[in-house]
């Protein structure tokens, strides 16, 4: 029975990998593959859409620039805010599952990736005293000839730019993210995403907004198990 479950899981994972591949951004691979030497974004090292060398840019705090975007146009981000920004960058560049939410009009982009409310609230809390000048980081910049970003408007605190975590998550990267009504079928950019992803992938993208309550229930149950297991591992290590 266990062997059957493992085989089935292998079939499901390999078919979803083939189905989705990677996004078509400038740093993305065609298909995810292992990257054992990643400096950052190690959540995705078993199956990654970015090369390990991409993550070198994220390895030293303060992070000044990633690809051709400066992160410090309104001063250096605080360490806690930087950490959240890095999680989003890692997901977009490296997650083998990001393409599940590919924007059909623009295949380098994602749309409506479900984030957990708690993740957005924590992110907002971490950044609220940092400053930015772009409401939408994808579009609200002046780009020079080399494609580097410059402020178009004045720098203001995050807490002035966005009303709350929900507003921030749903505005900062355009349509890329939405806050989920579920506390389980949503991503928070840590190991628990494994549980959520498994359930989210079993739904077709059209139905994702009306996720069935049985899927929700199954997810919650798995998450509890997963948390118990993590706690056990933590205690063994002590
Ligand atoms: C990163 O590594 C990949 C594969 O090893 C290579 O194709 C690419 O050119 C490298 N990129 C940079 C910026 O070094
Ligand atoms: C968050 O801000 C939005 C936009 O201003 C508002 O509609 C929403 O009610 C706020 N949510 C909470 C929980 O305060």
Curated annotation (Swiss-Prot):
InterPro entries cross-referenced by the UniProt entry: Folate_rcpt, Folate_rcpt-like
Q: Which UniProt keywords apply?
A: Disulfide bond, Glycoprotein, Phosphoprotein, Pyrrolidone carboxylic acid, Signal, Transport
Gene Ontology molecular function: any one: signaling receptor activity
* Residues that bear Pyrrolidone carboxylic acid: 18
Note the SS bond partners: 22-49, 41-90, 50-94, 74-155, 81-127, 116-186, 120-169, 133-151, 184-219
- Which tissues is this protein detected in according to the database? Yolk RBP is synthesized in the liver; egg-white RBP is synthesized in the oviduct.
Q: Which GO terms describe its cellular component?
A: external side of plasma membrane
Q: A Pfam family in this protein?
A: Folate_rec
Residues carrying sugar: 53, 164
Q: Where is the signal peptide?
A: 1-17
Q: Which GO terms describe its biological process?
A: negative regulation of sensory perception of bitter taste; negative regulation of sensory perception of sweet taste; riboflavin transport
Q: How is the protein altered post-translationally, as described in the entry?
A: Plasma and yolk RBPS have the same carbohydrate components, whereas egg-white RBP has a different, ovomucoid-type carbohydrate chain. Plasma RBP has the same C-terminal sequence as the egg-white RBP, which suggests that the C-terminal residues are cleaved off upon incorporation into the oocyte.
User: Where Phosphoserine occurs, residue numbers?
Assistant: 204-205, 208-210, 212-214
Known function: Required for the transport of riboflavin to the developing oocyte.
Q: Indicate the family of this protein.
A: Belongs to the folate receptor family.
- Give the protein name, as stated in the record: Riboflavin-binding protein
Source organism per UniProt: Gallus gallus (Chicken)
